[in-house]
């Protein structure tokens, strides 16, 4: 049985598992032993080698497959497809446009060269006309997008409705907490100003030592909202003005009955000063002075 198989007429070989030290000239020198090499397309760790005769390509594949080259065991086999980006199509496969048309399904031309109809308005996924693949309802990408769009409003609405009351409550609580100390301070200041101790403390010690001022009638006079003097203080002020205690004043003011002869002795015994200051000279206990 012959070794050579010319069913596809392929002249392009795939060379894999190349070493990082391998260069294009090294591959060209190795494969040129089996025939004329037309092109060497070197990649990172693999390459494509093209021969001028399919039989030379088959010989190179047979002898070089699994051989150690440049420190690595390479694999050599026929390539499975037409070359990309090459301009010489004489021995590399079918020319451009020789593939299968997506519009009519016939081999030998592309969809842009198809004369069966408007190929731009046909979907390549479902085969129906009137829309393109991007707008196809059967596209898996569109199904995913539609599912995500249908779910997104539900997800976005639920947390907003639940979070809005809590945010308003938290803001109101924060405002109330920040304002509460100020209100307490204002109330404390008002209570202090209303208390009598605040008025007493505002008076200077010099004003406290001063004796109360008397008006024209002899009664103590209130100055600048100061509290009225106690009955004991009024008694002491009256005694100082008369020049002695209430008892001494009563004794010194008594007039002899000889002077008041011809009149009522009970009325003449009292001095005019005693009549004026009789209410003020009453003791706190309610007993009258002699």
UniProtKB/Swiss-Prot annotation:
Residue positions where Phosphoserine is found in the record: 164, 166, 180, 202, 204, 211, 219, 226, 230, 239, 245, 256, 271, 283, 287
Low complexity bias (residue ranges): 146-156
Ranges for domain RRM: 11-81
Localization: Nucleus speckle
PROSITE patterns reported for this sequence: RRM (PS50102), ZF_CCHC (PS50158)
UniProt-annotated stretches for the region Disordered: 135-290
GO cellular component, one term: spliceosomal complex
Molecular function via GO: mRNA binding; zinc ion binding
Domain of life according to the entry: Eukaryota
Keywords in alphabetical order: Metal-binding, mRNA processing, mRNA splicing, Nucleus, Phosphoprotein, Repeat, Spliceosome, Zinc, Zinc-finger
Further details from the record: The splicing pattern of the pre-mRNA is regulated in a tissue-specific manner and by development, and changes in response to various types of abiotic stresses, but is not affected by the light/dark regimes.
Role: Splicing factor involved in constitutive and/or alternative splicing. Regulates the splicing of its own pre-mRNA and the alternative splicing of RS30, RS31 and RS34. Associates the cyclin-dependent kinase G1 (CDKG1) with the spliceosome and recruits it to U1 snRNP to facilitate splicing.
Membership in a protein family: Belongs to the splicing factor SR family. RS2Z subfamily.
Protein name per its UniProtKB record: Serine/arginine-rich splicing factor RS2Z33
Species name: Arabidopsis thaliana (Mouse-ear cress)
């Amino acid at each position: 049985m012959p070794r050579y198989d010319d069913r596809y007429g392929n002249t392009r070989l795939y060379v894999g598992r190349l070493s990082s030290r391998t260069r294009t000239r090294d591959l060209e020198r190795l494969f040129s032993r089996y025939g004329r090499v037309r092109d060497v397309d070197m990649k990172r760790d693999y390459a494509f080698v093209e021969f001028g005769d399919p039989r030379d390509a088959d010989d190179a594949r047979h002898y070089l497959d699994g051989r150690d080259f440049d420190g690595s065991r390479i694999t050599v086999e026929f390539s499975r497809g037409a070359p990309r980006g090459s301009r010489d199509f004489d021995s590399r496969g079918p020319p451009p446009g020789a593939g299968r048309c997506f519009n009519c399904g016939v081999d030998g031309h592309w969809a842009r060269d198809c004369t069966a109809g408007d190929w731009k308005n046909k979907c390549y996924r479902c085969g129906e006309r009137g829309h393109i693949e991007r707008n196809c309802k059967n596209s898996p990408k569109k199904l995913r997008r539609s599912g995500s769009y249908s779910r997104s409003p539900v997800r976005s609405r639920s947390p907003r409705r639940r979070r809005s009351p809590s945010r308003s409550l938290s803001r109101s609580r924060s405002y109330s907490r920040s304002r509460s100390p100020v209100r307490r301070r204002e109330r404390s200041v008002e209570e202090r100003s209303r208390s009598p101790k605040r008025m007493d403390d505002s008076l200077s010690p010099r004003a406290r030592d001063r004796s109360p001022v008397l008006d024209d009638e002899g009664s103590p006079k209130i100055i600048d909202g100061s509290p009225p003097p106690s009955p004991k203080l009024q008694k002491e002020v009256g005694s100082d003005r008369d020049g002695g205690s209430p008892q001494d004043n009563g004794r010194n003011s008594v007039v002899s009955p000889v002077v008041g002869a011809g009149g009522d002795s009970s009325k003449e015994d009292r001095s005019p000063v005693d009549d004026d200051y009789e209410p003020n000279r009453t003791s706190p206990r309610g007993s009258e002075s002699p």
